[in-house]
Design a protein with these regions (language model features):
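Hydrophobic pocket/interface hotspot
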Residues: 23, 33, 57-59, 75, ...
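A conserved amphipathic terminal alpha-helix motif
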Residues: 119-167
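Beta-strand/loop substructures that line and gate deep hydrophobic ligand-binding cavities in soluble
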Residues: 85, 90-138
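A generic structural micro-feature
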Residues: 4-6, 49-51, 65-69, 92-96, ...
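A short, structured loop/turn motif at beta-sheet edges
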Residues: 20-21, 51-52, 76-82, 103-112
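Hydrophobic ligand-binding cavity/cleft-lining segments
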Residues: 1-43, 166-167
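Intrinsic-disorder/low-complexity, polar/charged segments enriched in Ser/Thr/Lys/Arg/Asp/Glu/Gln
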Residues: 7-13, 20, 56, 70, ...
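Glycine-rich portal/gate segments that line the openings of hydrophobic small-molecule binding cavities
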Residues: 45-87
Length: 167
């Protein structure tokens, strides 16, 4: 996580040892997102996901203490396997907390992810940095890397199951 303390933006850059399509699918397929989104100890239930400009993702984060956190993401731009722009942290009772821009590029079979979280003020960004640190820092992005490593390694496996009756 990079940013100066006088910035309202928080920038995150990661390189994933996985092809672009695998990273994009992990971000956009509700079943895959549930495997890695959020801090360690949290789980996720997607209620609906309309991945298009003007679409919404309704989901609930389930905390390790049993607390539920209803969320809504509002998609502003969806460029398949390239870019997502969305407003994050809304629910039925509150407006979005910040805007996120994520760009994906593939270089030599690895995927570069550039993310910028734009908060409404320097103070809001400072509060977000503090919250992210308390919630485990970059744990979400580490979980994505772990999920992709497992997923990509399993794609190379081929299983044959056969049963027969022996005399």
């Amino acid at each position: 996580m990079n940013a100066t303390n006088d910035s309202k933006d928080i920038n995150i850059t990661r390189i994933y040892d996985a092809p672009l399509k695998a990273v994009w699918d992990a971000w956009t397929d509700p079943a895959q997102v549930a495997q890695w989104w959020g801090p360690r100890g949290f789980s996720l239930t997607t209620h609906s996901k309309d991945l298009r400009s003007g679409g919404h993702w309704h989901y609930t984060m389930h905390g390790p203490d049993g607390t539920d956190y209803p969320n809504r993401t509002d998609y502003l731009e969806v460029a398949p396997q390239s870019r997502l722009v969305y407003d994050h942290g809304a629910n039925d009772d509150r407006p979005p907390m910040f805007r996120v821009t994520v760009e994906f590029t593939e270089v030599n079979g690895k995927t570069h992810m550039e993310m910028c979280m734009s908060l409404p003020s320097v103070e809001a960004a400072a509060d977000a940095r503090k919250f992210i640190k308390q919630a485990g820092g970059d744990a979400t992005w580490d979980r994505l890397a772990e999920y992709l490593a497992m997923r990509v390694s399993n794609e190379d496996k081929f299983y044959i199951n056969r049963s027969f009756e022996a005399p």
